[in-house]
Structures are given as C-alpha cells and as structure tokens.
A protein has these predicted regions:
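Core segments of cupin and vicinal oxygen chelate
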Residues: 1-45, 82, 105-107
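Short, structured motif recognition centered on aromatic/hydrophobic residues
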Residues: 4, 46-51, 71, 122-124
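Vicinal oxygen chelate
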Residues: 15, 37, 49-50, 76, ...
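Short glycine-biased active-site loop of nucleotidyltransferases that positions the nucleotide triphosphate
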Residues: 26-30, 63-64, 113
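Short, charged/polar, Gly/Pro-enriched secondary-structure boundary elements
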Residues: 44-46, 59-60, 119-120
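Acetyl-CoA-dependent GNAT
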Residues: 53-56
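Long, charged/polar, surface-exposed segments that mediate recognition or autoinhibition
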Residues: 62-67, 85
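Eukaryotic phosphotyrosine signaling hubs
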Residues: 67-73
Length: 129
C-alpha cells in the first residue's frame, strides 16, 4: 500500500474483505478477497483505482521486457520528478524509464514509467511546459 498511498499520493477511500464465488468469477482459490479503493476525496471525478488481493494467490508473473497485448499499464497525471522522488525515498525504483515528448505550442511533456511491487506498470504524465 505504501507504493500507492505514500508514493503516488492516493487516499484509501474504502477497504473491505468480500466473500463470494471468486473461484467461479476469477478462477481464484478462495472465496475471500480483499478490496481497497484508492482515489482523491477532494477530486472524486478523477477516478478510482481498486486493488484486489486474494489470499493464497500465485506469485505475480515476471514483468515482460516490452508491452503486452491489451491493457498493460495504469496512466496517472502527476508531477514526474516529485512522484519519482517520493517513490525512491520509499525504496521503489524498479523499472523506471523517463522521456520527454514534444507537445503543441513548443512545449514538452515529461513522462516516466515505474513498476509497482505487484508488477503493474504505472505511467506518470507531467504537465506540459
């Protein structure tokens, strides 16, 4: 949770352990899952990230060297330098890559990716300057 909360600045909006037929729905090995909803309570229209954990789940697959087919990352608008510094201070530096992309009106947009501890690739998109 430190990666998502302390590093990326999300607030835990709601957390609960749900009981259901998760083996049928997800192919899980348990009927219990832990669900945590993260977001910004001051800006609820910016979206919510749900983290789901199953007890006894298999280890995460290795992160591939390149993009996977289909959805492969979570993209967030954040100050790139500040966010990467906050994550590094917490010990999170896996998979960091940075670029700058040309934008309209002669501006540039800083971008970076970092791999979360659970293997999710997170893209950071900074403001155009």
């Amino acid at each position: 949770m430190r990666f998502w909360r302390d590093g990326l600045g999300f607030t835990e909006l709601f957390g609960h352990t749900f009981t259901g037929d998760w083996p049928e729905l997800f192919g899980a090995q348990t009927n219990e899952l832990r669900s945590v909803f993260l977001g910004d309570p001051q800006m609820p229209d910016t979206g919510i990230v749900e983290l789901v954990a199953f007890e006894g789940a298999n280890e995460a697959l290795p992160v591939p060297a390149g993009p996977r087919h289909g959805f492969f990352l979570l993209s967030l608008q954040r100050d790139v330098n500040e966010t990467l510094s906050a994550l590094a201070a917490l010990g999170f530096t896996d998979g960091v890559r940075r670029i700058t992309v040309a934008a309209p009106a002669g501006k540039t947009v800083p971008m970076a990716v970092i791999t979360a501890p659970d293997g999710v690739v997170v893209e950071l998109i900074g403001p155009a300057r």
